[in-house]
Amino acid sequence: MQHQRNPQLNGQGELIHLLSIEGLPRDIVTHILDTAANFVSVNDREVKKVPLLRGKSVFNLFFENSTRTRTTFEIAAKRLSADVFNLDITRSSASKGESLLDTIANLSAMAADLFVVRHSESGAPYLIARHVAPHVHVINAGDGRHAHPTQGLLDLYTIRHYKKDFSQLTVAIVGDMLHSRVARSDIHGLITLGCAEVRAVGPRTLVPADMAQMGVRVCHQLQEGIEGADVIIMLRLQNERMSGALLSSSQEYFKSFGLTPEKLQLAKPDAIVMHPGPINRGVEIDSAVVDGRQSVILPQVGFGIAVRMAVMSIVAGNEACGH
């Protein structure tokens, strides 16, 4: 057995599972973004289908709800001509006590080729990837607080689309870092692509102490965090993951860390504003910014389909044995 081999890559260094942006070589990240650029044009055509996954079965296994992420994966798979199956796990065998690996084994017996997995436990997609047959691929659609690699990739794609050269950019990520798998994926991706400066911005209770070890500049004041920024990524306040008194109130949060048109003037004049969604208007971001000229939030959602098409087509085209 090879020492510390990246479980996402085969022996030839090709991507066979997408579990995390962390540890992916820069050339693979760039290849995904380049492939996504080709698929953006497919999504603009009258006939939006390509036959790359014809005859393949894609199972969306969402142990945690997310209508939008699941829908974009479903659209992406269908545009690649795959057969798509959505499993509402909360109402199926898993709720009756069947173990995660039993569920996977049973679905594998139905000739699954690709599992898209969202799970509240960090590491669940890794566990599945270790136990599937060599021809089966796993894509992490979000695991606990750990990672959300396709959201990270679509954020990178959006930044590259509007700003081109990462080595010249200052990117501020603002909000609830403590619970955000998107923030972690964005940070790993930005650092991999050579971003000049990444700032983690938020109150002390929501920006973990270990953030600085990831190579980011930690800022506990919004004004300092977004001053001179080229890109601002606003994060949703994740009330469903919060326990204890991390915040006094959403009104207080908006006063200190909510992005308003006035505060946005501290950033570069051509700065873009992003948000992975869903948006809490009036909590982390003002409606005038969401709907304003510097917002790229809607195009960001559209790019998600092309990025997920790219990931699925790349992993499904590579065999685990390296053939």
Curated annotation (Swiss-Prot):
Residue spans crossing the bilayer: none
Swiss-Prot/TrEMBL keywords: Pyrimidine biosynthesis, Transferase
EC code: 2.1.3.2
Pathway entry: Pyrimidine metabolism; UMP biosynthesis via de novo pathway; (S)-dihydroorotate from bicarbonate: step 2/3
Pfam families: OTCace, OTCace_N
Family: Belongs to the aspartate/ornithine carbamoyltransferase superfamily. ATCase family.
Designated name of the protein: Aspartate carbamoyltransferase catalytic subunit
Species this protein is from: Verminephrobacter eiseniae (strain EF01-2)
Gene name of the encoded protein: pyrB
